[in-house]
Curated annotation (Swiss-Prot):
Transmembrane segments: none annotated. Its EC number is 4.1.99.17. The gene is thiC. Keywords: 4Fe-4S, Iron, Iron-sulfur, Lyase, Metal-binding, S-adenosyl-L-methionine, Thiamine biosynthesis, Zinc. Belongs to the ThiC family. Catalyzes the synthesis of the hydroxymethylpyrimidine phosphate (HMP-P) moiety of thiamine from aminoimidazole ribotide (AIR) in a radical S-adenosyl-L-methionine (SAM)-dependent reaction. It holds the Pfam family ThiC_Rad_SAM. It comes from Thermotoga maritima (strain ATCC 43589 / DSM 3109 / JCM 10099 / NBRC 100826 / MSB8). Pathway: Cofactor biosynthesis; thiamine diphosphate biosynthesis. The keyword rRNA processing does not apply. Substrate binds at N66, M95, Y124, H163, S185, R186, G187, D226, G227, M228, R229, E265, F292. GO terms for molecular function: 4 iron, 4 sulfur cluster binding; carbon-carbon lyase activity; zinc ion binding. It is an enzyme of class 4 (lyase). This is Phosphomethylpyrimidine synthase.
């Protein structure tokens, strides 16, 4: 049985117990949300996960970190180090999005070492294999769509991005649209190119039941990818984006009927004033399914600092109901991220998630804020460092300019906390 099917039958799995303990909630709440499809617990039957996560309504906002190779940069050891650093700094899941080297070796290695759920985009493999065989990136068969999904499932992948909403109708609309950037989703572009070349419907959409059968066999959580997401704030919230969303909303019900866990992916470039509308619409059309957002970025002019823009958009999106934030690194739109980029990206998105949790009244988040306040009151630096996301940076800065008494070198003898303590 899938986690959803177990939940519907009143069965509480070990993973449900673990996430309930982590969230600080009764396991019955976990079971109920999973049964309703308002939360997902990504866990392939073949993958042993030490730190499972629950994503959805009523739970803490989660953060995903993308890693993976690219042409000219295909070191397995570097990707393993990226994974290690991402997890160390608080990533709740990883996605392996490699497009060069031995993709299966890399994927299996990350799944084997990862204590958290691992996701992927299977269609990349089809395109990469075609390119490496000196063919066009869309020169693969309809059968390849599903063969790659099975291969990823057999390798222990817990959740998969499937761009099922890129239909012929949606594609026709995008061709005549006034968008500046027509398609910016790599998976969406590959599928769109295949559809145009072969003059066929998207196999993932046309044969969605076959996809559901595979997902159910392995208990793969389907992340319905938004292949028509806007790639710039000037293109945000247009007809193409929402038409695809309506397709995805219809498929949520079909997945639930089959007992397959499902979530919706959302736009990555959204002006701040449209974030609330986008999140609420996704929740409504998706019948309360969890929402997985890339960012979102509320400006396109932050190159080199896109992780900061991402944190701003992500915090607001999380407050309005987004459940899962995909990080963005300082290298976004520029180059393949290195290990340091991964660290910076995870910290920025974790800040956004924490800000959202506090604003939403998450009990655990507020308890940690109280601990930090008390540590500051008591000048308990070690506790402050331990509660901080960037504890190594915080400690380094403190030690670089030390102060011999209570407080720090910012205020010295004029520390407000110390003065108030002395004269109160």
């Amino acid at each position: 049985m899938t986690q959803m099917e177990m939940a519907r039958k009143g069965v509480v799995s070990d993973e449900m117990k673990k996430v309930a303990e982590y969230e600080g909630v009764d396991v019955e709440i976990v079971r109920q949300k999973l049964a309703e499809g308002r939360a997902v617990l990504p866990k392939n039957k073949l993958h042993r996960i030490e730190r499972p996560m629950i994503v959805g309504e009523g739970f803490s906002v989660k953060v995903n970190a993308n890693i993976g190779t690219s042409q000219g940069f295909s070191s397995l050891e570097e990707e393993k180090e990226k994974a290690r650093v991402a997890i160390e700094y608080g990533a709740d899941s990883l996605m392996v999005l490699s497009t060069w080297g031995d993709l299966r070796e890399i994927r299996r290695a990350i799944v084997e070492m990862s204590p958290v759920p691992v996701g992927s985009v299977p269609i990349y493999d089809s395109a990469v294999r075609s390119y490496q065989m000196k063919k066009n990136v869309v020169d693969f068969s309809e059968k390849d769509f599903f063969d790659m999904v099975i291969a990823h499932a057999e390798d222990g992948i817990d959740f998969m991005t499937i761009h099922v909403g890129v239909t012929r109708r949606v594609l026709d609309r995008i061709k005549s649209s006034r968008r500046v950037l027509k398609i910016v989703s790599r998976g969406g572009a590959i599928i769109a190119g295949w559809m145009i070349k072969n003059n066929k419907e998207n196999p993932f959409y046309e044969h969605f039941d076959e996809l559901l059968d595979i997902a159910k066999d392995y208990d793969i959580t389907l992340s319905l990818g938004d292949g028509m997401r806007p790639g710039a704030v000037v293109d945000a919230s247009d007809a193409q984006q929402f038409e695809e969303l309506f397709v995805m909303g219809e498929l949520v019900e079909r997945a639930r009927e089959k007992g397959v866990q499902v979530m919706l992916e959302g736009p990555g470039h959204v002006p701040l004033n449209e974030v609330e509308m986008n999140v609420r619409l996704m929740k409504k059309i998706g019948k309360g399914a969890p929402i997985f957002l890339l960012g979102p970025l509320p400006t396109d002019r932050a190159m080199g600092y896109d992780h900061i823009a991402c944190a701003i958009g992500g915090a607001l999106a999380g407050y309005y109901g987004a459940d899962f934030l995909c990080y963005v690194t300082p290298s976004e739109h520029i180059s393949l991220p290195d290990v340091e980029d991964v660290r910076e990206g995870v910290i920025a998105s974790k800040i956004a998630a924490i800000v959202a949790d506090v604003a939403r009244g998450n009990k655990k988040a507020w308890e940690l804020e109280k601990k930090m306040a008390l540590a500051r009151k008591n000048f308990d630096w070690e506790t402050m460092f331990s509660l901080s996301l960037g504890k190594d940076v915080a400690k380094k800065k403190y030690e670089e300019r030390p102060y011999p008494d209570k407080g720090c070198s910012m205020c010295g003898p004029f520390c407000a906390i110390k003065i108030a303590e002395e004269f109160s």
